[in-house]
Amino acid sequence: MSEVFDSKSFLKTVTSQPGVYRMYDASGTVIYVGKAKDLKKRLSSYFRSNLASRKTEALVAQIHNIDVTVTHTETEALLLEHNYIKLYQPRYNVLLRDDKSYPYIFLSGDTHPRLAIHRGAKHAKGEYFGPFPNGYAVRETLALLQKIFPIRQCENSVYRNRSRPCLQYQIGRCLGPCVEGLVSEEDYAQQVEYVRLFLAGKDDQVINQLVSRMEQASQNLAFEEAARLRDQIQAVRRVTEKQFVSNNGDDLDVIGVAFESGMACLHVLFIRQGKVLGSRSYYPKVPNGTELAEVVETFVGQFYLQGSQMRTLPGEILLDFPLTTPELLAETLTEIAGRRVNVQTRPRGDRARYLKLARTNAATALTTRLSQQSTISQRLTALAQALHLPEIKRMECFDISHTMGEQTVASCVVFDANGPLRAEYRRYNITGITPGDDYAAMNQVLRRRYGKAIEESKVPDIILIDGGKGQLGQAKSVFAELDVPWDKHHPLLLGVAKGSDRKAGLETLFLEPEGEGFALPPDSPALHVIQHIRDESHNHAITGHRKKRAKVKNTSTLETIEGIGPKRRQMLLKYMGGLQPLLNASVEEIAKVPGISQALAEKIYYSLKH
């Protein structure tokens, strides 16, 4: 316990009401956030002579100050606790690493509704279906829907400015509501209603309506229409057979738990209307000495209460671990959802099988993760030994990418003890230098990255410079001139140069620009981690450069093609539905655009591709 903090005097002032407390260290940083039904009773437990765990002992030893916020109810305290955890990211709390919002399928409220992928707050008028576990699952579903129910997916800016149908209409993926006379209002509205029912899990209603229409078409001798409806029915049935899990129309989140060697995996299975939308594994950041009960309770709280306004809550949550206060979580989620949300930890029947599936997935994912972590840990230990460092907690690596000096991009990738920290990867657009001057580019990115205040925990142990002696010299000169509050002498600057034939395993490492380099054995784990972070940095830079180059190229290439003036350019973009469909189109598809000959289509195709 910190000598600076007078716990006895503090506890005399604490109320017994529900609320949230924030613990600070000597630097004023929030190190822990907690909630309590009885603040006095809970906070007193931290200052007993026999504490529950080493983690608690380490926490209490750093307490310099405690702030308390009283709430009316325990539910308010629970919500406020998770808002504070999200805000402060305290190092002694279990932290959910991935907090980005989940994607939904959005059906707009326009006169001719469109389908789109959506993340974030639900401000736009329309209907939202989901959540889906990732963007890929949404895009796959949208592609499927487009084949079965051809309603538009184009942006309103494209839709409002069309005079001819685009390629999507030509290949049967859109009914073409943008052009008058191609589809009746009733037919388009019917397809929109099918989409709405399908996404709501009411597949039987869709099939029954389609069967009824097919029979009516047959009676009217409209055999082409009947055949089209038959194909649509078969497509819907194929999809629903693949997705089917339960005939109860369940809306469930099923959470399996695995915990080993201080690492936790929580695998969430998303089931909506009896269909599996997908699943996802989460690996929360777990402070040393944390009990599994705290990991699970904190994860569940953060998962559902942080950003809850953007999440569609299920009717039921199945959990592979008993919570101490499941009623509190259920009441809080019920209040947020405006309807009953149940939390079950001992389900039976089909629900028990769902939970077993989630548990198996969690265990498998954790085993894979631990294996990867073990490899990364061994490699970092070997590198620390090779460079005579006590340990390596954080590494950063820089690379430069450009084409003949144009669209120069610098990348910075970050590794910690667990491997790549992709959320902290950064790209920097380099400007104001002589084209092709890699030294100036490196100088600029290092000044932008390190010429400011940095948290102590974010100061890297190693800064890897891809490029050898010259680039290392730039790094040394930048660091010599830095005037910053953090210890600029802490990072080890390490240059890496590829061999003459640029083969992996022939890299030369430099600690000084003027000194001799040294090489590590090709089978060295230390070399493997250097290759890993360097390749990550290179790929990150290349990807950023290509995106930047493509943006410039694609906006200007059409203007440079002989025979393509403003009118034809506008016609191409309108007819194809925008630049991206044009980039993906074949010569034959481009030649269908009015005013574009076969020869001109070939010229356009090759100009855009090369």
From Swiss-Prot:
GTP-binding as UniProt keyword: no
GO molecular function: DNA binding; excinuclease ABC activity
GO biological process, one term: nucleotide-excision repair
InterPro entries in alphabetical order: GIY-YIG_endonuc (IPR000305), GIY-YIG_endonuc_sf (IPR035901), GIY-YIG_UvrC_Cho (IPR047296), Hlx-hairpin-Hlx_DNA-bd_motif (IPR003583), RuvA_2-like (IPR010994), UVR_dom (IPR001943), UVR_dom_sf (IPR036876), UvrABC_protein_C (IPR050066)
SUPFAM superfamilies, A to Z: C-terminal UvrC-binding domain of UvrB, GIY-YIG endonuclease, RuvA domain 2-like
Example of a GO cellular component annotation carried by this entry: cytoplasm
Location(s), subcellular: Cytoplasm
Domain named GIY-YIG: residues: 16-94
UVR domain segment(s): 204-239
One Pfam family named in its UniProt record: UVR
PROSITE patterns the record matches: GIY_YIG, UVR, UVRC
Main localization of the protein described in the UniProt heading: cytoplasm
Superkingdom of origin: Bacteria
Function: The UvrABC repair system catalyzes the recognition and processing of DNA lesions. UvrC both incises the 5' and 3' sides of the lesion. The N-terminal half is responsible for the 3' incision and the C-terminal half is responsible for the 5' incision.
Subunit composition and interactions: Interacts with UvrB in an incision complex.
Protein family (similarity comment): Belongs to the UvrC family.
Name under which the protein is recorded: UvrABC system protein C
Native species: Cronobacter sakazakii (strain ATCC BAA-894) (Enterobacter sakazakii)
